[in-house]
Amino acid sequence: MCAELIGTAFADRLYKKEYEMIQENILELVKYGLSTGLVDPEDKVYTINRLLELFQVDEIEDAVFEKVENLPAWTQEEAEGKLEGILAEMMDYAYENGLMAENSIVYKDLFDTKIMGCLVPEPSSVRKTFRDLYEHTSPLAATDYFYKLSCDSNYIRRQRIKKDRKWTTDTEFGTLDITINLSKPEKDPKAIAAAKNAKQSAYPKCQLCKENEGYAGRVNHPARQNHRIIPLTINNSDWFVQYSPYVYYNEHCIVFNSKHTPMKIERATFGKLLDFVTQFPHYF
């Protein structure tokens, strides 16, 4: 009986520690959002509450709030360095409390994208900021904002990109850039089996379609709650621009049609390319 009581008391203390830790993680993640500019100060409480809902936590205790609030402010660089650790602890909590089906890379990517989606401004807000910067400052300022947002949102995973191997070599045709991309994770056997058995869906039709923006994902399709796209008019037709999450080269842009159409190179392709670089001359 005594041992049973001791075991219960230990379990209670362990649960309380985990409960306090997830509250700290939530506040630290919001602090990250504020430090990087992802979260507007006016949206701080709203963002905290969205994360509480996601983790099925009812409150932020006063002691936890004071502990995190009293921490020194973070620079952009400091915030970037803390994100991976914060998300790792959040996913540990999610798995241990039944919020994440498997503790594997595929399920972690699905869940941490869902977490980051709570911090990213709505598409209309991102597009308005982009247009304002383009019209009143410069095209460069607009793309700088959009690229930074794509990184800060963890859509472009900075910590994984750092693992890529890059070097140059001189050839008879000039200097050649060589990249070995290590940032795209390999699926584990369980995820491969789950993807094989998953219900097939034609939505979104491909990983570049506009319907990916905000999509929750599944084992055979990446989550995109933290993904934003910018509408463009190219050669009098509707297009979008986004950045590649794998960054095969600096500020790797993807410009795609608003309709799901086959990719092909034809005479009109070069006109579209010239129209794009006319609008964004710094990408020429």
Report the location of each language-model feature.
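Active-site microenvironments that recognize anionic phosphate/pyrophosphate groups
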Residues: 2-263, 283
